[in-house]
From Swiss-Prot:
It is a multi-pass membrane protein. One of its GO terms (molecular function) is gap junction hemi-channel activity. This is Innexin-8. The keyword Ion transport applies. GO terms for cellular component: gap junction; plasma membrane. The chain crosses the membrane at residues 29-49, 103-123, 187-207, 270-290.
Amino acid sequence: MFSVPFLTSLTSHLGITAIDDASDTLSCLITAFLFITAAILTSAKTYVGSAMECWLPQTYSGDWGEFAENYCFLKDTYFYPRQQSMTDIPMYHKERHRLTYYQWSSMYLAVAGIAFMIPKFLWRLSQSTTDMPVVYFCDTANEIKNETEDKRSAKIKEMARFMRTKITSVHTPSLFSFIRMYMVYSVIKILYLVNAIAQFVIIAIFLGQKRNLFWGWTLFMNLLNGITWETTGLFPRVTFCDFQVREMAGNNRDETVECVIGINEFNEKIFLFFWFWLVFLVFSTLIAHFYNAAQIVKPYFIHSLLFAIRDHDIVDQKELFREFGEKYLTMDGKLILSFVKSQSDLVASEVAVEMYSDFLEARDRANIAEDKYNNILKNGKQ
């Protein structure tokens, strides 16, 4: 089978599992892969190719010319429209149109790619430091979903018993000792969303567009209307660099040279793509997280799993279902069942039915014990 080596390696290190939904994979795998790939491409263009070439005076020798280009590449340059006079360029214009990103674009993209992996890393850390083996339930559901009912029955009972034990047991001491799994899961989901929004803002600040977070849309419309960088100054190909030359007499001579930043041709396309990608990522992550949360919280989730045993003749069954979901399963149990449901609706339903039977038995035992206790109190008063 055809595979991309880097993507395969990234997948294995991130450990994409059954408990990761599509929005998680989109963020921690696909987005990270895109950013890191872009970082590799831009670094090759920046540090291997010719990122900047300057138009230098003829008096500059080869070494002087190379020194001047390296200096201008490391030092921030500024954009100034070529159709305007170059005499006495205001300092405020130089500061406002200063380019500070082209040297660091590959590093930024690499760091951003790593940042998208952080929520996944924390989710894996939480899995390894708690007593809730969520992956086990998903893997088991995936294994038995195509088995016959007889072969599946034993595993269903085992899963239900194991889930009941884990939900009701006290966690071993760890970083997440007093935090329920659903709370950890919710925090991780929020981190995915916060990370996407933060990167949307950071990319604007990095490119010097902090006053216009919608610079990507502006650039896109400019390209459609034939308005180029020569007018807007967005990702300019030609900039200017100021430096001083120390002469033998001890005097310093100010020089201004015109430089071509070839990497900006590439940066324009890369960062425009990522602007649209981050907009898509923010909205898709937001929608996915609200949808997943709503699916677990609303009563229909439990009703759908217990559909096979619904009896409309039982007056208080809805109340029993509600008590089963809120007090017996708790949010942790419903979260696990949602993961199991993502692998097999049938297995999730059968596990829920098995646990509901245990819930009714435990409820009956509790009622009997309560009646005995009340009778003892009543007889004692007599």
